[in-house]
């Protein structure tokens, strides 16, 4: 929806295993075209990966969603098999594609996509940090009583309730550090509210959120498709960056036509470094449950 409404893609293909579902969604969206002023062609297919052939960018959202009370990690048993099969099928028909992984547990599913496809690290991207950062900025703006457009902030680390690392040392309001406006106690509350952002919505909705995740994905897709060279926090394979190796976890990256153009290493506070290490250990523990 967001990708079509932004009108930067010539074609979008929706694929689902539920008979007729993707076709119906595509038709419903296409009937918005004249009302919303976009020319993107949207089609749907039930399980026919040949319809996705030669895609520049593929987004994997496949798997079961969270239910109230579930952690993202509890989804691994079912979602790992699904993501592995989907990633392999996409690469078969679009060998030069860039893959964005949304399925949970997202960092582990991004790592699995690497292993299943053998693609270079710049072409496998996990979405989580972009969404978590949007939720962080929402909570910061709420605490500051400020417009969200005045606020900037980023979340690194794993895409899990315990693994997120909201970077308060880099959070600003109009380029002024938020520590000038908020007490340490208030900032701690902002961080906690950010970490449980997904769980809060799951409890309210009875399932996973969709508007903000969709907006986050469209931002990543647009940055790649339009070669914007924009910075987002994304899950990517680390090979020594931030002192971490052989795992996918959220860090700042530059996105452009080649996918991840650069991993950006920024200075973290001592507390943030410690939390990042703890987060990495949690991701590696979840990775250990994979049958590679």
Predicted regions and their residues:
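Conserved N-terminal glycine/acidic-rich loop preference
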Residues: 21, 27-32, 56, 109-112, ...
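Rossmann-like NAD(P)-binding element
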Residues: 35-98
């Amino acid at each position: 929806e967001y990708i079509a409404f932004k009108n930067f893609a010539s074609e979008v293909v929706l694929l689902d295993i539920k008979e007729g579902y993707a076709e119906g969604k595509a038709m419903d969206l296409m009937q918005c075209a004249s009302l919303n002023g976009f020319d993107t062609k949207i089609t749907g297919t039930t399980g026919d990966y040949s319809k996705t052939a030669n895609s520049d960018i593929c987004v994997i959202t496949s798997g079961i969603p969270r239910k109230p009370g579930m952690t993202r990690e509890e989804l691994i048993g079912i979602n790992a098999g699904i993501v592995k099969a989907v990633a392999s099928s996409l690469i078969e028909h679009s060998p030069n594609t860039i893959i964005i992984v949304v399925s949970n547990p997202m960092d582990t599913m991004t790592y699995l996509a690497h292993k299943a496809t053998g693609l270079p690290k710049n072409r496998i991207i996990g979405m989580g940090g972009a969404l978590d950062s949007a939720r962080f900025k929402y909570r910061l703006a709420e605490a500051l009583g400020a417009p969200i457009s005045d606020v900037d902030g980023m979340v690194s680390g794993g895409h899990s309730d315990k693994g997120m690392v909201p970077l308060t040392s880099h959070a600003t309001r109009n380029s002024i550090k938020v520590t000038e406006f908020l007490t340490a106690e208030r900032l701690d509350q902002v961080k906690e509210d950010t970490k449980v952002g997904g769980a809060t919505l799951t409890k309210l909705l009875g399932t996973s959120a969709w508007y903000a995740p969709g907006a986050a994905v469209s931002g990543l897709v647009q940055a790649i498709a339009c070669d914007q060279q924009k910075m987002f926090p994304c899950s990517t394979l680390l090979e020594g960056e931030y002192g971490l190796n052989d795992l996918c976890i959220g860090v700042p990256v530059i996105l452009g036509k080649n996918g991840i153009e650069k991993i950006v290493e920024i200075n973290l506070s001592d507390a943030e470094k410690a939390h990042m290490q703890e987060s990495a250990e949690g991701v590696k523990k979840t990775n250990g449950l994979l049958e590679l």
